[in-house]
Amino acid sequence: SEEVFNRFPNTIKLTACAMLLAVVVAVPLGAVAAVKQNTLFDSISMVIALIGVSMPIFWLGLLLILLFSLKLGLFPSSGSEGIKSIVLPAVALGFNHMASIARTTRSSMLETIRQDYIRTVRAKGVAYGVVIRKHALKNALIPTITVIGLQIGYMLGGSVLTETVFAW
C-alpha cells in the first residue's frame, strides 16, 4: 500500500492532464461538428471519435511510442521527468475519453439547436455565432459535464495501464 501512495500523485497528475486535453479538444470539436452537421468535417470528426472509442489504451500507447519516440524522437518513451514525458501518456489516456466527450457534445448540441428558444433568439435577429456560443453551447454542456464527471473515475483506473505502458 505504501507503493500505491508513492505513485498516486503521478496518477492524479496524469489523469488531470489527460482530462484537460480531452475536454479542450473534444468540446469544440463536438460543437463544431454539430453546427456543421452532415458535412465532411462532421463525418471525419465522428469517424475519428468512433476510432477513439474503439482503440484500447495500451495499443494507442504503443503506436504513440513507435511514432513520436522511436521514429520522430520528439518525446521520451518512458520516465516521468519534465513536461515532455507526460504528453504521450496524456494523449493515450485522454483519446478514448476525448472521443466520448466529442460525441456527447455533438449529440447534445444537435438537440439544443432544435429547441424552440433557439429559434426564437434567431428570429429576434441575434447573430448565429452568438446564439451558438451564448445560448446553445451553454445548455448543451450540461450532459457533457455529467459525462466528464463520470469519466474521471474511468481515467483513474485507465491510468494504471497507461503508466505501465509508458513506464511512467
Question: Which stretches of residues belong to each language-model region?
Answer:
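Hydrophobic alpha-helical transmembrane segments of membrane transport/permease proteins
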Residues: 1, 69-88
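Alpha-helical transmembrane segments of integral membrane proteins
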Residues: 8-41, 57, 80-168
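Membrane-helix entry/capping segments
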Residues: 1-7
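Membrane-interface helix-entry/capping residues at the boundaries of transmembrane alpha-helices
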Residues: 42-46
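Membrane-water interface segments at the C-terminal ends of transmembrane alpha-helices
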Residues: 47-76, 92-97
